């Protein structure tokens, strides 16, 4: 109530006190249950502690007994005692580390057997006499005189070990029992908590359904109250038309001028920024389009040249075609994905915009309903003040009637005293005169209060009485006065009946007014509760829709991030593949250059061989002439083949180098084209990102402008109701004497004015506003 400014003074109500008492009772029951659990756990821990102390005590006693026996033992029984010590050591270790009785017994027996066998193996083969002496108990008893005492000590030792084992098993059983009980209690508590959780969920579902039904009923009641309030507003508008119209027109003009000026400034700045950004983007887009067109022309020319080269060579590179096809396929795939993501984002933005519009309409409807309920509360406050004035008037009337009843009671008491003493003093004329004077005064008072015209002067005129006394003194007898008293009694009875009727009517009227006041108070409390519940539901819905909008935005950002990551991944894959292909082309070119170098070397060798062989060939005719003119046919055939090979090599040499140069030029052009293609793709992606950013910013600006326009329309539609509600709240704020009421009324003003944080800070800095501002809002 205090949060929404509905409690205009006073302490906590009876309902709040009962709720606090119930919560304290629940807390006491919880604390009692926790205390019982703590006591139970403490008792179980005490049992475990006692069991562990008993086991520790037994172990310490066994250790002391072992020490005592080892100190008193004779030298002839060294080996059995060592065996027993080992067995006891093994049993103590096993019982100290085991988790149950069976494992402890098994470990003890196994370790004892292993100890005896190890001792026997370590002792080795004994001589026959020693084996016979130590083989049986009779031999030991006949050979040594201390045999019976050692046997009794061994029996005591065995009995002591058995008792220790029994105590250890009992302590272990108690510990396991406590652990199992704790585990069972833990499982029971877990089951109970699950059941409580299910019950709480069921209760929450039922409460949610009930609240939805209550919300529907409240909406219907709000519609009814809205219709009633409209009629009341029409009635009140006729009464306060002049002042309200003047104030409304002035405030409307001022607000419209301010809003128009602010809107024009904001729109001017936004349009300037938008025009500058669009002009810059348009210039960039035109420049990029020109660059892309130029590059596409160059690419087409280069493609034509490549096609001519391929046609000349008639050996197209299949890997380059596959690369281009794959690049085109990836480009189309990415464009399709981009268009699909853009459609998804546009659809999500449309859904968010529609949902935000619906939520704003609902919030506006709820705010109008809240303003109407606040106006209804103002009317109820006025009716309450009127009822209080009527109650005050009725209280004054009741006090007046109480005074009349008191006077009537005094008159009745005086009349009874007159009746009692009438017989005794009826014969005295002076006494009767005094009584008549008193009765006359009482009659005058009663006549004034009951507004009955009685001619008291004529009845009790002293001149008439004096004349009657002088004329006929004998007629002043008891009968005359008794008749007058009878008349007075009748008049008194009539007045008494009238007073009773008045009292009855007053009581019935007070009862009806009290019932009406109680009904009005109950209705006011119900309306306050409904207002609070509606406000809370409105806030919950608003927070829920804000959360949904944030989730949508996060999902959109996530999808965009995934798309960008996939795009970058595909670009990286494409770059890796292009780099690999470029490396292969470079390797192929290196191999071609190496082959060309080898061919050059071979040609040089052939030329050198041809030159060396050509010199004797030229000299052969001289020798032939000197030698008789005969030559070798094999030498002539070899020289002819060499000259033909040289001629072929010389003829094919320019074409081979031209082919190598063309291959190198083609590789250089391909690498440059790939670089240009990569650069163009990067620029295209950057342009797409910029266009997307520009589109998002434009959509945000359009949404902000639409929300601002809708807010202005809502403000204009709700201006009359808000001004009326604000007038009532400010009137209440100015008429309240206490600071607590002022703070609560100020919180009610906040529900309609919606101060910004900067305005709140300015108000808090002021010395006068800081005292009015509530501590919870700072």
Swiss-Prot record:
UniProt keyword terms in alphabetical order: Coiled coil, Cytoplasm, Golgi apparatus, Membrane
Any Gene Ontology CC annotation: Golgi membrane
Residues that span the membrane, as ranges: none
Ranges for region Disordered: 70-157, 186-208, 617-638
Cytoplasm is among the record's keywords: yes
Record's function text: Probably involved in maintaining Golgi structure.
Protein name: GRIP and coiled-coil domain-containing protein 1
Biological source species: Mus musculus
Phylogenetic lineage: Eukaryota, Metazoa, Chordata, Craniata, Vertebrata
């Amino acid at each position: 109530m205090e949060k929404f400014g509905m409690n205009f003074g006073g302490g906590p109500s009876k309902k709040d006190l009962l709720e606090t008492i119930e919560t304290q009772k629940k807390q006491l029951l919880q604390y009692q249950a926790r205390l019982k659990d703590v006591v139970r756990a403490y008792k179980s821990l005490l049992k475990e502690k006692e069991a562990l102390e008993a086991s520790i005590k037994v172990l310490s006693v066994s250790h002391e007994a072992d020490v005592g026996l080892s100190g008193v033992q004779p030298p002839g029984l060294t080996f059995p005692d060592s065996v027993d010590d080992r067995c006891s050591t093994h049993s103590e270790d096993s019982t100290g580390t085991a988790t149950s009785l069976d494992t402890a017994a098994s470990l003890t027996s196994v370790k004892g057997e292993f100890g005896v066998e190890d001792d026997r193996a370590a002792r080795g083969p004994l001589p026959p006499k020693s084996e016979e002496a130590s083989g049986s108990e009779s031999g030991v008893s006949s050979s040594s005189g201390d045999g019976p005492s050692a046997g009794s000590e061994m029996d005591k030792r065995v009995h002591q070990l058995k008792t220790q084992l029994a105590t250890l098993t009992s302590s272990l059983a108690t510990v396991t029992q406590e652990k199992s009980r704790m585990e069972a209690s833990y499982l029971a508590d877990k089951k109970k908590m699950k059941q409580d959780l299910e019950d709480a969920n069921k209760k929450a579902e039922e409460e949610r359904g009930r609240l939805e039904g209550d919300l529907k009923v409240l909406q219907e009641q709000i519609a009814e109250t809205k219709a009633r309030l409209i009629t009341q507003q029409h009635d009140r508008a006729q009464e306060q038309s002049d002042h309200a119209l003047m104030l409304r027109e002035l405030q409307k003009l001022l607000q419209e001028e301010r809003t128009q000026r602010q809107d024009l400034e904001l729109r001017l700045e936004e349009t300037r920024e938008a025009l500058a950004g669009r002009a810059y983007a348009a210039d960039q887009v035109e420049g990029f389009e020109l660059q892309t067109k130029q590059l596409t022309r160059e690419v087409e020319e280069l493609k034509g040249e490549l096609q001519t080269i391929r046609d000349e060579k008639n050996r197209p590179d299949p890997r380059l075609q596959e690369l281009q096809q794959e690049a085109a396929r990836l480009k189309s795939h990415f464009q399709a994905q981009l268009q699909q993501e853009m459609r998804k984002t546009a659809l999500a933005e449309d859904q968010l915009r529609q949902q935000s519009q619906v939520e704003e309409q609902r919030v506006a409807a709820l705010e109008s309903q809240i303003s109407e309920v606040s106006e209804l509360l103002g009317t109820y406050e006025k009716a309450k003040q009127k009822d209080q004035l009527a109650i005050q008037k009725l209280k004054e009337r009741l006090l007046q009637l109480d005074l009349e009843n008191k006077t009537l009671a005094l008159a009745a008491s005086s009349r009874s005293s007159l009746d009692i003493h009438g017989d005794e003093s009826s014969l005295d004329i002076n006494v009767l005169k005094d009584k008549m004077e008193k009765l006359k005064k009482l009659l005058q008072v009663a006549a004034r209060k009951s507004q009955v015209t009685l001619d008291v002067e004529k009845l009790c005129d002293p001149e008439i009485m004096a004349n009657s006394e002088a004329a006929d003194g004998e007629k002043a007898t008891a009968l005359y006065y008794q008749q007058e008293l009878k008349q007075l009694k009748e008049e008194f009875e009539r007045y008494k009946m009238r007073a009773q009727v008045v009292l009855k009517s007053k009581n019935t009227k007070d009862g009806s007014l009290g019932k009406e006041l109680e009904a009005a108070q109950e209705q006011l409390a119900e309306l306050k509760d409904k207002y609070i519940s509606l406000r809370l539901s409105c806030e919950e819905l608003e927070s829920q829709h804000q959360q949904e909008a944030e989730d949508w935005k996060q999902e959109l950002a996530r999808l965009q991030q995934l798309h960008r990551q996939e795009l970058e991944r595909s670009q990286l894959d494409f770059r890796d593949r292009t780099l690999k292909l470029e490396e292969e082309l470079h390797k192929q070119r290196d191999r071609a250059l190496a082959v060309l170098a080898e061919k050059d070397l071979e040609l040089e060798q052939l030329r050198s061989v041809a030159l060396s062989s050509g010199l004797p060939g030229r000299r052969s005719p001289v020798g032939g002439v000197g030698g008789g003119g005969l030559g070798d046919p094999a030498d002539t055939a070899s020289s002819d083949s060499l000259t033909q090979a040289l001629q072929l090599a010389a003829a094919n040499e320019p074409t081979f180098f031209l082919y190598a140069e063309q291959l190198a030029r083609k590789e250089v052009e391909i690498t440059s084209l790939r670089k240009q293609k990569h650069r163009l793709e990067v620029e295209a992606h950057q342009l797409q990102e910029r266009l997307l950013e520009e589109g998002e910013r434009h959509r945000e600006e359009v949404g902000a402008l639409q929300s601002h326009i809708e807010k202005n329309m809502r403000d204009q539609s709700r201006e009359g109701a808000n001004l009326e509600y604000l007038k009532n709240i400010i009137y209440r704020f100015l008429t309240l004497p206490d600071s607590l009421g002022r703070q609560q009324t100020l919180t009610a003003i906040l529900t309609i004015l919606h101060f910004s944080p900067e305005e709140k800070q300015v108000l808090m800095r002021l010395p006068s506003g800081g005292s009015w501002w509530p501590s919870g809002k700072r």
